[in-house]
Amino acid sequence: MSHGRMNLALSLVFILCGLFNSIFCEKQQHSQKHMNLVLLKKISALSQKMEAHPKDFAQELFKALIIEDPRKNIIFSPMAMTTTLATLSLGIKSTMRTHHPEDLKLEPKLLDVHKYLQPLVHVGRELVKQKVLKHQHILFINRKMMVNQMLLQQISKLQGMDIQMIDFTDIEKAKKTISHHVAEKTHTKITNLITDLNPETILCLVNHIFFKGILKRAFQPKLTQKEVFFVNDQTKVQVDMMRKTERMLYSRSEELHATMVKMPCKGNVSLTLMLPDAGQFDTDLKKMTAKRAKLQKISDFRLVRLILPKLKISFKINFKHLLPKIDPKHILTATAISQAITSKAPLPNLEALHQAEIELSEHALTVDTAIHTDNLLKVPVKAKEVPAVVKVPMKAKEVPAVVKVPMNTKEVPVVVKVPMNTKEVPVVVKVNRPFLLFVEDEKTQRDLFVGKVLNPQVE
């Protein structure tokens, strides 16, 4: 068996542009203050709840998505959504000039929302240190607005945010300015970002993250072949099935009717595949969090022959339509805003879409995520080749063997320790029916991505 190295490129780019119709005439300043207050309270309340119970949020979101699109593939980033909403609430707060912090029912000294971001900020900083993550917040604010400069300085310091004042009334100039600034900050990885813009925009938040990971060993291209994937009892499709054999975390439960494998990546990140038994997929979705936790508890390192389909799927989430189905009490809706505003005034418009795409092949797993008003950005990112050392747990009687893998002259040889016990029979995990996938940060056990693959042939 050859021991190649698999480049796992998880390129994550998520962008949010919050577009709000604002009122600037003297008679309506009081109404605008109340609208911003409602926006801040509701968005920050939701982001705090998402941060406090991340896996519960992911499961609730899954349930809502399944109800809305039961026969579709799903991929999304719970962490991206949490960070986006929390950061957006900071931007809204910066546009409020009040001499009574107690009116906000938030910590008057600093940013109450910020403490809920700390675990995510810490995750980001650690991955940046390991050179597998790059990220930045860019906040564009209408220069005609009166803003809280002290608060903006705090946001810039704590979040490392780049703050730009801009004139949104000249739409074409504003679009070019934003797109050019973002392209410059991302080294032209993101170009022509803004295609549509409202002249009454007060805030435009851009949050971009590029994440790269490396799996220890690649699938073997020469072993890929066509096989049947059972979408359901009535539907089956022919797909390219990849293969590789290696030691990985494995768990199997007859009681839970599910199998799970977990593969480590560089940067304390892992890729987990959860395969429900035939006929148990819908049940597993309803109890996803509990079953996953139980399977992890009983997992151990085993020699596994993994057979997995090549796939490319994408999915779009509309914040405005979906989030009220998860928690109507804390979601920003037109009804909720109108009830909180005493005087008649146009309602602020909040549009945000979350669209993600995932592609899995023999040599790379690429995840692109974009949060934007109306467009999906596809940013191909090549992962740097990093020498890998694969340590495989062995039995007492096994003798380690050193396998030298041919590489470029400038690269350091890869040392792979493999078991020499030829009598060991690998456990076969054949993913030929709907399954779940998770890309997780190991230190915090936070999900960077969550996905449901129903049909690998359908994008």
Swiss-Prot record:
GO terms for cellular component: extracellular space. GO terms for molecular function: serine-type endopeptidase inhibitor activity. Residues 1-25 form the signal peptide. Belongs to the serpin family. UTMP subfamily. Transmembrane segments: none annotated. Pfam families: Serpin. GO terms for biological process: female pregnancy. The keyword Signal applies. It comes from Bos taurus. This is Uterine milk protein. Keywords: Glycoprotein, Pregnancy, Protease inhibitor, Serine protease inhibitor, Signal. The record marks 420-421 as: Reactive bond. Glycans are attached at residue 268.
